[in-house]
Amino acid sequence: MNKPKINVVKKIALPKRGDSLDNLAGYPTKFELPLMEDISGKYINTLYAVKDITVDWNAYKDHLAKVKPEFHPHVLFVGHDSSEIENITLMSLGGVLQHMNGKANYALLGHNNINTLNTIIKNKQPEWIGFNLYTGLTDFVFEWIKHYKIERASHILKKNIFDFDTADKALKDMVREAKGPIYEGDQVLYAPIIIGGHFNNYSFDESFVRGGDYVVRGKGINILRDILLGLFVPGIYHDPMPYANIPRMDREVFYKDMYEFSDKTKGYVFSK
C-alpha cells in the first residue's frame, strides 16, 4: 500500500494547560521537523511546539527572502464548486504561500469540468497541486489523479504505464528522493499531490492509496509550510495542536482567479 517510512521521535513534550501558545520569537529560524509520533500505523502526529510555529508571518517572509532568496513555491489549490460561501480554507493556505514569497492559484471545479484542470496546469505551471476534499465529492477527483499520475509517470520514465499502483509508487519514490516536485531544468515534470479537507477526518488512508503524495488531516497551516520547505516525505500527517497562527488570507488572488472566468459574486471558476 506504499506506506511512508519515517523516523519517529518517542519522547514528546507538549504545551500544558495555561501555557502560552504564542511563539514570542515570531518564527523558527531553523528548518527542521517537529516531534512526531506514529498513531497505530495510521498516520503521523506532527506535534509542533510553540517554538516551531510561525506567528509573525511578515517577519518570516522577510527572513525567508534573506536566507532562501531563490525560494518561491507555487501551489495550485483546487476545491469543489458546490459551496456558496468563501473558501476560507484555500485562502488561508494561500496566505501561507504569500508569506513564503510564493504564489497561489485557485480553481473550484465539479465532476463536469474536472478535466479543465489539465489546461490550468499547462497554463499556470504549478509546482504543487493541493486538493481540499469534501466527503461525497471525491470520486471524480481521484479519477483525475489516477490519469494524471499514470500520464506523468509514463512521460518521466519514457515508457507506457497502465497500472495506477505502479505509477503511484514510482512518483512517490521520486518525490521522496527529490523532497518535492520533479523538474527537468526549470520545467516542472510532476507537481506532487497534497490532499486535505473534511474527507480526511476518516478516509485519510483512502486519500493516500488513491494518489495523494502528502495527505493532511486536521489543520494544515504548519504542515503545508514544512511540506513546501521539503522537510516531509510522502505520507499521512495530522496536526492536532490548536494554534491560532493563520496568516492574512489571500482574498485578492482567490477572487482574481474566480473572476477570470465569471463576473458573478459567486465566482466559481470553471463551474459552467
Q: Where on the chain are the PLM-derived regions?
A:
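Acidic, low-complexity intrinsically disordered segments
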Residues: 3-272
